[in-house]
């Protein structure tokens, strides 16, 4: 009798272990309640292969396991405290989140956090959703840059056009302009002073050479940049070097209160071409200062197509070279008006237009020139608006005559390159050309016939125009596009008389 009872007890014990294992696997809500040492994948696979567990398991002898259906339902509702209890959560009830380690506990009266079932997209490592690669460290997303580029920023101030540093004109060029302008005002022929009345343009070039460092200077090189020189219509060239009065320490004593020295001017040797002697002259005394003028036209005719002109100066006394500094030719710390000056005289065959110089300073086409003139006009609009005086009203019944026209280059914004004059009286012609035409209007035969036809039938023939019949030139001292000071005489700048044409 004892052996059957023992076998029955063993069977009950094995059934109990098997049911507890199955209940543990099927009843765990998440990984946090799985026993240690079990693998989720294996447990799920075993759960799918096994048949569903019957609610009522009969024990031998007709007794049900766990107190029948009533005990099973009780354990399903609230038997979480019992190990191995089988619980089945409701379908509509969301799963409860387990509390995080160290996290705050839910407050009384507030429902616990729940986990909603949502579809989750798995993104490969190193890639953003949508197949985009993540930005590199330190880089800025292109969408951010594009957004910043589209955003309207603060208005930018218009940049002023680049202006070169102001050029100080040589004193000789200012003196030359005053002399020739006075001759024009006095009625004299100023062109006589310009190479036998043929030249109307003088271009000046400032020396760019420097003396060698040393206690004695026996040779000086004078260098001039002539790359921007107009090569047509050249008539002459000269070199002007200022000789200052030397100090008593630099001038040795000599009989007669002075000493005689010879100056030799030659071209600089280059390559296979040796130096060519240009001029030799004597310096009788060193008690005063003055300009040494050398005519170098014969040499310059062969070198006018070069971009640079180089000349050498030496001083000889009693058959040996002497220090040029002791003769007053020291170039150290000289001002602009004291530097050596190279002058080129010329006259172009075609009539020069003032418009060409404006074109050379502003651009290469006419459109650019007009834009330059418009910009200069806008800069001076405020000063012009504040000018005193009103323009006289037009008298349409007045006959053709010369009227005042004052030109101010400073108001036009050209005072940065025009040195003199800054203003002048140009005059203009205004009025009617009616029949009969007066003799002082100097009408042509065609103008007389046209005026007669206009008086007979105004609709078929237009009237003649009041235009300048005689114009005179003016001289202008200006800075060209290469920053060289130029004296030039421009024709047809002032109206002298008006007529009908």
UniProtKB/Swiss-Prot annotation:
* Residue positions assigned to the propeptide: 28-381
Q: What is the effect of changing residue 373 to R?
A: In SYM1B; the mature GDF5 protein is detected as the wild-type in the supernatant derived from the mutant transfected cells
PROSITE patterns cross-referenced by the UniProt entry: TGF_BETA_1 (PS00250), TGF_BETA_2 (PS51362)
Segments forming a coiled coil:
none
Q: What molecular functions are annotated in GO for this chain?
A: BMP binding; cytokine activity; growth factor activity; identical protein binding
Q: Which residues form the signal peptide?
A: 1-27
Which residues fall in a compositionally biased region of kind Pro residues?
99-111
Q: Please describe, based on the UniProt annotation, the reported consequence of changing residue 380 to Q.
A: In BDA2; reduces activity; impairs processing
Q: Which parts of the sequence are annotated with region: Disordered?
A: 29-169, 246-265
Recite the UniProt keywords alphabetically. Answer: Cell membrane, Chondrogenesis, Cleavage on pair of basic residues, Cytokine, Disease variant, Disulfide bond, Dwarfism, Glycoprotein, Growth factor, Membrane, Secreted, Signal
Comp. bias intervals (Basic and acidic residues)? 148-162
Question: What GO biological process terms does the UniProt entry carry, in alphabetical order?
Answer: BMP signaling pathway; cell-cell signaling; chondroblast differentiation; chondrocyte differentiation; embryonic limb morphogenesis; forelimb morphogenesis; hindlimb morphogenesis; mesenchymal cell apoptotic process
Q: Tell where it localizes.
A: Secreted; Cell membrane
Q: In which tissues is it expressed?
A: Predominantly expressed in long bones during embryonic development. Expressed in monocytes (at protein level).
Which SMART domains does this chain map to?
TGFB (SM00204)
Q: Which family does it belong to?
A: Belongs to the TGF-beta family.
* Disease involvement: Acromesomelic dysplasia 2A: A form of acromesomelic dysplasia, a skeletal disorder characterized by short stature, very short limbs and hand/foot malformations. The severity of limb abnormalities increases from proximal to distal with profoundly affected hands and feet showing brachydactyly and/or rudimentary fingers (knob-like fingers). AMD2A is an autosomal recessive form characterized by normal axial skeletons and missing or fused skeletal elements within the hands and feet. Acromesomelic dysplasia 2C: A form of acromesomelic dysplasia, a skeletal disorder characterized by short stature, very short limbs and hand/foot malformations. The severity of limb abnormalities increases from proximal to distal with profoundly affected hands and feet showing brachydactyly and/or rudimentary fingers (knob-like fingers). AMD2C is an autosomal recessive form characterized by skeletal abnormalities restricted to the limbs. The craniofacial skeleton and axial skeletal structures are normal.
Write the protein's name.
Answer: Growth/differentiation factor 5
The organism's lineage? Eukaryota, Metazoa, Chordata, Craniata, Vertebrata
